[in-house]
């Protein structure tokens, strides 16, 4: 069975990012995948980014997956063995969350081949995507803020494992009660309108994304099995 792993890089287990990931899971499940969600900010997880131990570069050592022993290592093992991988994160000051960046460091660096950069050390082909949520109002402002350089670059590095794509949800509803916070920049009425009109469309995009990735993975596997 196709295995699809979903990584929530938001501290909130039911926030905008998590909701989109769960909807993508619905699509993947509908397409026949076995799905699993990991919350990186779960208090039971104790880990950091790359520790520069270079264990993944030792001659004759284990290749293609981070072997540093901590709570993230088993999750990384699942990630490199998955058929589909979908990561999600809020935009924090123009970057993915620190938790997701640490995950990406640990997943992607073992794939870097210091003997031949053109031949990454990849254990299997993975169809992947990254879902971003943010206050940024639209794609035009997203580009004006140079977010493609800061955020898309991080997401596109997953392309070393196979085809990858990015889904952005703009102008998201951030607070349950805007009156409680110093946030005069935002129009609470407008935010609520976007939540009620645009966010459901983004949820549908996430559903189709999850389904599409699983279907793409199955097509790729069928092509390989046919020896073509």
How should these model regions be labeled?
Residues 1-116, 185-228:
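N-terminal beta1-alpha1-beta2 submodule of the flavodoxin-like/Rossmannoid cofactor-binding fold
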Residues 9, 40, 131-133, 169:
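Cofactor-binding loop segments of dinucleotide-utilizing enzymes, especially the Rossmann-like FAD-
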Residues 47-51, 142-143, 176-181:
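Short aromatic-enriched loop/helix-cap "lid" or pocket-rim segments at secondary-structure transitions
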Residues 92, 133-137, 172-173:
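Short acidic/polar capping segments at secondary-structure boundaries
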Residues 160, 179-188:
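The feature marks non-catalytic terminal segments
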Residues 165-176:
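Beta-strand-loop-alpha "switch" segments that mediate conformational coupling across diverse proteins
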